[in-house]
Design a protein with these regions (language model features):
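Acyl-donor-binding surface of acyltransferase catalytic domains
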Residues: 1-66, 109-116
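Short amphipathic alpha-helix that is part of the acyltransferase structural core
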Residues: 20, 24-31, 59-116, 129-139, ...
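A short helix-loop-beta-strand connector motif used in the catalytic cores of GNAT acetyltransferases and
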Residues: 118-131, 151-154
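Glycine-rich phosphate/pyrophosphate-binding loop shared by adenosine-nucleotide-utilizing enzymes
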Residues: 137-142, 189
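Long, hydrophobic, well-ordered secondary-structure blocks that form the structural core
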Residues: 144-151
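Acyl-donor binding region in acyl/amide transferases
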Residues: 154-273
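Accessory, usually C-terminal, subdomains that scaffold auxiliary metal cofactors
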Residues: 238-316
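Charge-patterned, long linear interaction tracts outside catalytic cores
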Residues: 314-331
Length: 331
């Protein structure tokens, strides 16, 4: 199924599929109708292909990574660069992935007739979408950088600035420690929806997807260094936090929070998991380019044995060469 086959509105048909909870989702839906609906949403989006997407974006992508011998193509684009039908497809991928793992509420999706995450107009900076596509055009991985809700940038320690989603969920303030002259909330982005396709066959190619995403994130920060100075979010220790530390970030992490969202928000189940995410924020390190070169050098070995070890070896070299540790960009 191609992206042009995506429904234009309303609910997709339900069918006699395995219930959503059978795939390991949590919490199980409270009604069989919601279960069937959620299962069909997942089934619909696992058949979607986006083969033409790289050639359909408006203008040049912020980042394009291709030709590394693994058949993967990774692009980073601002939301306005995505044609509407592709944007809906990308948001549908997000919905399907997080319904499948139980981090979104299938009852809400069913009641609202959602086949993709709701589209919202950004009051501040546009969302930056990063996608890794297979040779067949399937989305293999995804991550978003979400900007501040402030229409105009405000100082990071301004008492009336808008909160980022992670701050709202954890009821913490993350940014005042990174306040600096000329740095505003429009220089901060939250990392969200970092995910590898849960249905992708595990193997040498799937192992490379998170590295593609991290390389694209880093190159995006380098390309937009005046704009992206601080990142924040929430993550489990073995998730985005681990990846960020590996590439030179020294994030401020707040432990022992009790995150939650109102039960009328689609993502509320994500904060009622056995292992909870921790909120974090950190300045983009000054030696980020070296770490990105290290990832690229590993990925350029294609799927040859030991490519990950080669990349990690380069990381250690970069770290050793930074006598004073990571320095902040645009400090």
């Amino acid at each position: 199924m191609t992206i042009s086959s995506l429904p234009s509105a309303g609910r997709v048909p339900t069918g006699a599929q395995a219930p959503l909870g059978a795939a390991g989702g949590w919490p199980p839906p409270s009604t069989s109708a919601a279960s069937r609906f959620g299962t069909e949403i997942v089934r619909l989006h696992t058949r979607m292909t986006f083969r033409g997407l790289p050639d359909m974006i408006e203008g040049e992508p912020i980042v394009r990574i291709v030709g590394l011998g693994d058949g993967l193509t990774t692009i980073a684009v601002r939301e306005s660069q995505l044609p509407s039908r592709y944007l809906r497809g990308v948001m549908g991928f997000r919905l399907a992935q997080f319904l499948h793992i139980g981090w979104m509420d299938p009852d809400i999706a069913y009641r609202r007739g959602l086949y993709h995450e709701p589209l919202t107009s950004a009051a501040g900076p546009q969302t930056i979408h990063t996608l890794t596509l297979t040779a067949e055009g399937r989305i293999a991985g995804y991550v978003a950088l979400v900007g501040s809700p402030d229409t105009a940038g405000k100082a990071l320690d301004a008492p009336d600035r808008g909160l980022f989603p992670a701050e709202r969920a954890h009821r913490v303030e993350l940014l005042s420690a990174f306040s600096a002259p000329g740095r505003t909330t429009h220089n901060v982005y939250e990392i969200k929806r970092f995910v590898r396709d849960r249905f992708m066959e595990r193997g040498p190619v799937s192992e490379r997807v998170p590295w593609h995403l991290m390389l694209a994130l880093g190159r995006t920060a380098l390309a937009l260094s005046d704009e992206i100075q601080v990142v924040c979010g929430d993550s489990r220790e073995n998730g985005a936090l681990r990846h960020l530390r590996l590439v030179g970030f020294e994030p401020l992490v707040i432990d022992d929070t009790r995150p939650s969202l109102p039960h009328d928000e689609l993502m509320w189940p994500s904060y009622e998991q056995p292992q909870l995410a921790k909120p974090f924020a950190g300045v983009v390190p000054g030696d980020l380019a070296g770490y990105m070169d290290a990832i690229a050098s590993g990925l350029e070995l294609a799927c040859a044995p030991g490519w990950q070890g080669a990349a990690v070896g380069r990381f250690l070299e970069v770290r050793a060469s930074s006598a004073d540790g990571p320095e902040a960009m645009a400090a």
